[in-house]
């Protein structure tokens, strides 16, 4: 893992943490020094619990913002898990393999899909599939980042989470449980002026 300094559009590598281990991150903070650590106002991290604990301990005054990329990755993994389960289920029941070779149709941003992927996605979304429900929930979640008001963003997040928990899609529900555990850290994105991600 890498540690960067990001100031008003400037990005500078501060250090490389050896592997994904707590000891490595603790060593980074020790080497970085207490004085410099005290000057850190915002830190951007993923949701890995050991890192969150170290950041809370070593940077108690810093605002921890969850990285949008990691949240999007976890959500995409949940959608893909729904897709994989449904591929197996449809195969077992003897249906045509419509979801085969469609993985990236559900994982890529809509604007990054090729014409062929757009056609395949349009064809697939005509069916009543669990994968489609997961995909539409994923697309709807993107609206969270567009809010300017933290209060409205929190309202949206809670509504989206409640709707997703009713979806009967276990991988999506697991993602929601993770989000709910970190709701305050997620909302820090707005406290930080939507500039860190």
Segments the model singles out, each with a brief description of its role:
Residues 71-92:
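Short alpha-helix plus adjacent loop in nuclease-associated cores
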Residues 7-12, 26-27, 31-63, 69-73, ...:
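Acidic/histidine-rich catalytic cores and adjacent linkers
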Residues 1-4:
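Two-metal-ion RNase H-like nuclease active-site motif
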């Amino acid at each position: 893992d890498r540690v960067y300094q990001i100031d008003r559009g400037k990005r500078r590598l501060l250090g490389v943490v050896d592997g994904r281990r707590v000891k490595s991150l603790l060593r980074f903070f020790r080497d970085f020094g207490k004085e410099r650590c005290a000057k850190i106002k915002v830190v951007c991290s993923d949701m890995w619990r050991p890192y969150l604990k170290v950041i809370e301990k070593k940077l108690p005054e810093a605002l921890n913002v969850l990285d949008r990329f990691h949240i999007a990755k976890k959500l995409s993994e949940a959608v893909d898990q729904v897709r994989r389960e449904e591929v197996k289920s449809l195969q077992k029941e003897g249906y045509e393999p419509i979801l085969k070779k469609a993985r990236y149709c559900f994982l890529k941003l809509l604007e990054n899909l090729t014409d062929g992927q757009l056609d395949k996605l349009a064809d697939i979304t005509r069916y009543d599939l669990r994968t489609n429900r997961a995909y539409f929930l994923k697309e709807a979640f993107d609206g969270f980042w567009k809010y300017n008001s933290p209060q409205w963003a929190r309202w949206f997040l809670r509504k989206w989470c409640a709707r997703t928990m009713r979806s009967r899609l276990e991988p999506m529900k697991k993602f929601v449980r993770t989000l709910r555990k970190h709701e305050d850290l997620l909302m820090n994105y707005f406290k930080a002026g939507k500039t860190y991600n």
